[in-house]
A protein has these predicted regions:
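Nucleotide-sugar donor phosphate/pyrophosphate-binding loop at the beta->alpha transition
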Residues: 29-36, 69-72, 80-97, 136
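Active-site proximal beta-strand in glycosyltransferases
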Residues: 48-50, 57, 61-82, 106
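Carbohydrate-associated surface elements
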Residues: 111, 133
Length: 180
């Protein structure tokens, strides 16, 4: 399988404009990444392809076609989650193609799993939830025992619509008001 390199973005020297950052044209960057993945898939020996979220799905799909190896995708969120239902059709198409091509799909929550199954029409047997998690530190119990006089309410998450920081602010205000 040959990659059509004529559709990728290059600079005036003919080099791929691949930055690894979010450029002005994100879809072009995804295509450039796909081209790099095709070269790697032709030259490396590997057992499995892991595509981590929609930006890497086209590269993973192409690597799968070249290598015949299974592909697992990891879904932290879908465009339904990120946009709260105002889905970008280009992003949806890439997400759907990645999910359709995947041999297995890992989601980080049951909510995301249900979205993948219902909105992207995936077989439930193909989708597994593996929650984000950390091991609690030994000293956490000691922190709970300390006598704090000040009130501490913490939000741990990106400040994006899907993380719901506005809900945190509402709940924090209620908690603070009820503990006076």
């Amino acid at each position: 399988i040959k990659y059509n390199f004529s559709r990728i973005g290059t600079n005036d020297l003919g080099c791929i404009n691949f930055s690894g950052r979010y450029p002005d044209n994100l879809l072009e960057e995804i295509g450039n990444y796909e081209a790099v993945a095709s070269v790697l898939a032709h030259s490396l020996d590997f057992d499995i392809i892991h595509s981590h979220d929609w930006l890497t799905y086209p590269a993973g799909i192409f690597a799968k076609r070249i290598s015949g190896k299974p592909m697992v995708i990891h879904v932290h969120a879908t465009d339904y989650d990120r946009s709260r239902g105002n889905v970008n059709p280009d992003v949806y198409r890439i997400e759907k193609e990645g999910m359709d091509a995947a041999d297995h799909i890992i989601t980080v929550s049951n909510l995301t799993r249900n979205t993948v199954i219902e909105k992207y029409h995936q077989d439930p047997a193909k989708v597994t939830t593996v929650h984000n998690a950390v091991e609690p530190l030994d000293f956490v119990d000691e922190l709970h025992k300390s006598e704090r006089k000040d009130k501490v309410i913490t939000f741990l998450g990106r400040i994006t619509k899907q993380k719901g920081p506005e809900y945190f602010v509402e709940v924090a205000a209620r908690v603070l008001a009820s503990t006076d």
